[in-house]
Amino acid sequence: MKKHIFEDARAIAAFLVSVFDSRLKTQEILWLALSGGSTPREIFRTWAHEFRHHLDWKRLRFFWSDERCVPPTDAQSNFNMTHSALLEPLEINPDAVFRVRGEDAPESACAAYSQEIEARLPRQRGVPCFDIILLGMGADGHTASIFPHEIELWDHSGCCVVATHPDTGQKRVSFTGHLINNAHEIYVVVTGREKQDMLASVASDPHASVPLHAWTLPKRSGCWIPLLRGLYPRKQCKPTV
């Protein structure tokens, strides 16, 4: 994995815009899956206000790597956060937005989202292929909504699964490793000192039973982990391969 250190969310936002722009120079549509959380919110706001004229946002198609099973107006909804921070300010056409129907029964929402992805995305090796997937990592090593206590869901053969939060029992719809590993590029944004030990484990422990350790990308895929500077002591803040 390659690792980049960024000063703040704006620097990550600028980096990702350059990634999007590079892809849009060689293709008409960019298929993008987003994540939720506080850091993505700041990135999305920066895109909407500082980079709105740097990119033809109408050529992006928006999906989510995971979603809580709540209505789209709920404060916990990843779609709701993205809509207010990014989609609405940029006046993105609803036809370019593909959300999980979190208000439906979890199994129904999961099946419908899997079908949407299967029907719309281009395919590589017989599997739907996103151009770019943005992910985060929890302090327990989870990514999307695949938690360590349900690590077997990572290897599910479908595009999406119904996952359960280990503490609250809340149901979520999540991408699987089957779908994530097939993306052209994947970027994991990790912030917070509380994640330092887990990130070190993911990077060095071959037996770590966390989803990101099961992340086996083809060599053609750019596997980057953008980090905010506060994650590590200053002396460790340098790009590595």
Curated annotation (Swiss-Prot):
It comes from Treponema pallidum (strain Nichols). The keyword Hydrolase applies. Signal peptide: none annotated. One of its GO terms (biological process) is carbohydrate metabolic process. Its EC number is 3.1.1.31. The keyword Hydrolase applies. It comes from the Bacteria. InterPro entries: 6-phosphogluconolactonase_DevB, Glc/Gal-6P_isomerase, NagB/RpiA_transferase-like, PGLS. Keywords: Hydrolase. Pathway: Carbohydrate degradation; pentose phosphate pathway; D-ribulose 5-phosphate from D-glucose 6-phosphate (oxidative stage): step 2/3. Belongs to the glucosamine/galactosamine-6-phosphate isomerase family. 6-phosphogluconolactonase subfamily. One of its GO terms (molecular function) is 6-phosphogluconolactonase activity. This is 6-phosphogluconolactonase. It holds the Pfam family Glucosamine_iso. Hydrolysis of 6-phosphogluconolactone to 6-phosphogluconate. It catalyses: 6-phospho-D-glucono-1,5-lactone + H2O = 6-phospho-D-gluconate + H(+).
